[in-house]
């Protein structure tokens, strides 16, 4: 069995698919009970439940990897189950945390509060790989033999952090419960549509996974034909998602009854935007390692960018820089939360991004050359200009950074060397503030449907399970660098979303 490709497919599907399944189960149960379960719990309690479920997932890891040896397939599937449980908990946390953060103050600054929360998360994803390498291997380089006993301790620590966070929320008296008693209106049409979508996706992915469980064809023509069929199955699941949302968008505009939160066009458009945004954020870095490792010029040992092919150890600093770019943008986007004076805010918009970049360089001390630091510093300056032009306007921010992100991907496609490499890496920087902008715009004006709408948006984190494997298949069939046209198309939709949502919200205000 070819575990390399199946591994990436299953890990993405188990984790990001759990967001979709968790939010879908919550929605179906609410529909059956004829009350919004999350509204009944309240945002605060919902977040606590999510943290506790994720705790269970982290604890499941302990017996799964107890005495495990590298390469054991049964251990791999046990890890997938644990990841799925963690993802289910995250699904509840996201469903509650995002509208909760928006509701804590002026809705206009809701995206800034989401940026603040996201900035903390991004710091974790930046230092996380280094911390894991140090704990498991005893070095920051990630070289050596993994010790599973240390991994057990790591997951116990993660479980303890989840419990600590849950305790903070539970005992905090200053945080509102977020309970609402709005009457529940069934959304049966939306429920049946989502169930049908789920069936289609499971058929598509199930078939793809099955093809990896049987011997690969030895005849080149048959192997190539199978790759195209796998790609077709993955694209079918993508079309099913887009088609379902478009169907709801069209049908609810003529008769809103039975569609629930999906009757609001800003939500339907936002669901596809979240799907696309998460997909592009995950797929850029998921395939970046392969771009840097895959040898295309065997004589000179060069990769597709014309740079020396790297090992897993060599690419770690670039993956850290990619996630660090997300941290830079979110720290900068959160400045408005602290209500600085106009003059101080302008200064902070320049200083904070470089402080965040300094943190990245520090945690990767000695890894980056001066040339790499200068190149990324210039890219950070471009983002700073974007923030000044956007002026905290969510729609303007989306437009600007989606356009810059699209341009960056095109530069990566049509150039080579460090310019192409850093163009792809900059995708993290320009994606960084999109989640809060999309989320706050999508739930604007939903009223009693806010928690249901939030649940629908969380379902669309599914993009992280569908878009990366599509790019991976395109890379297998064509070339890894050309597969980044997938990212170009994602940014193109985000530009379109910004314009369409601006029109929709303008009409509703009038």
Question: Locations of the language-model features?
Answer:
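Glycine-rich segments within core transmembrane alpha-helices of 12-TM secondary carriers
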Residues: 109-137, 161-162, 453-468
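Intracellular juxtamembrane helix-capping segments at the cytosolic ends
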Residues: 92-109, 288, 432-447
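C-terminal ends and interior cores of transmembrane alpha-helices
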Residues: 52-72, 356-369, 386-391, 403-416
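C-terminal membrane-cytosol helix-exit motif in multi-pass small-molecule transporters
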Residues: 132-141, 156-182, 192-216, 233-252, ...
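Conserved MFS/SLC helix-loop-helix module at the cytosolic interface between two early adjacent transmembrane helices
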Residues: 21-77
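Extracytoplasmic gate region of multi-pass secondary transporters
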Residues: 199-233, 260-320, 324-329, 361-366
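Hydrophobic core of transmembrane alpha-helices in multi-pass small-molecule transporters
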Residues: 70-93, 374-379, 419-434
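Central cavity-lining transmembrane alpha-helices of secondary-active solute carriers
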Residues: 9-36, 61, 320-332, 463-466
């Amino acid at each position: 069995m070819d575990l390399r490709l199946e591994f990436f497919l299953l890990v993405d599907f188990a984790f990001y698919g759990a967001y979709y399944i968790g939010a879908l189960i919550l929605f179906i149960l609410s529909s059956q009970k004829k009350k919004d379960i999350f509204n009944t719990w309240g945002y605060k309690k919902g977040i606590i439940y999510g943290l506790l479920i994720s705790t269970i997932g982290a604890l499941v890891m302990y017996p799964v990897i107890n005495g495990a040896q590298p390469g054991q397939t049964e251990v791999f599937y046990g890890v997938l189950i644990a990841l799925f449980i963690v993802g289910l908990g995250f699904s509840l946390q996201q469903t509650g945390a995002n509208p909760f953060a928006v509701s804590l103050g002026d809705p206009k600054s809701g995206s800034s509060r989401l940026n603040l929360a996201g900035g903390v998360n991004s710091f974790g994803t930046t230092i996380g790989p280094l911390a894991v390498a140090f704990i498991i291997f005893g070095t920051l380089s990630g070289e050596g033999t993994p010790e599973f006993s240390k991994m057990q301790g790591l997951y116990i620590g993660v479980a303890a952090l989840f419990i600590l966070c849950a305790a903070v929320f539970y005992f905090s008296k200053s945080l509102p419960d977020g309970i609402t008693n709005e009457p529940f209106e069934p959304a049966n049409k939306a429920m049946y549509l989502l169930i049908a979508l789920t069936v289609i996706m499971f058929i598509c992915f199930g078939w793809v996974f099955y093809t990896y469980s049987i011997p690969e064809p030895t005849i080149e023509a048959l192997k190539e034909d199978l790759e195209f069929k796998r790609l077709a199955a993955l694209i079918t699941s993508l079309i099913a998602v887009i088609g379902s949302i478009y169907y709801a968008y069209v049908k609810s505009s003529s008769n809103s009854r039975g569609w629930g939160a999906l009757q609001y066009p800003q939500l339907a458009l936002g669901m596809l935007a979240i799907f696309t945004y998460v997909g592009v954020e995950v797929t850029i870095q998921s395939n970046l390692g392969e771009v840097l490792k895959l040898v295309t010029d065997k004589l000179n040992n060069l990769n597709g960018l014309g740079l020396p092919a790297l090992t897993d150890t060599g690419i770690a600093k670039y993956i850290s820089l990619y996630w660090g770019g997300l941290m830079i943008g979110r720290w900068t986007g959160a400045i408005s939360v602290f209500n600085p004076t106009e003059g101080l805010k302008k200064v902070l918009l320049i200083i904070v991004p470089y402080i965040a970049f300094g943190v990245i360089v520090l945690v990767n001390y000695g890894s980056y050359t001066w040339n790499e630091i200068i190149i990324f510093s210039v890219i950070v300056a471009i983002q700073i200009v974007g923030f000044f032009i956007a002026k905290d306007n969510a729609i303007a921010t989306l437009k600007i950074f989606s356009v810059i992100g699209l341009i960056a991907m095109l530069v990566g496609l049509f150039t080579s060397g460090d310019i192409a490499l850093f163009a792809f890496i900059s995708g993290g920087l320009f994606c960084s503030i999109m989640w809060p902008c999309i989320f706050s715009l999508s739930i604007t004006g939903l009223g009693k449907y806010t928690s249901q709408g939030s649940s629908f948006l969380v379902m669309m984190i599914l993009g992280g399970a569908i878009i990366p494997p599509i790019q991976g298949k395109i890379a297998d069939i064509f070339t890894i660098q050309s597969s980044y046209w997938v990212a170009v198309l994602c940014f193109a939709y985000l530009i379109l979303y910004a314009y369409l949502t601006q029109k929709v919200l303008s009409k509703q205000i009038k």
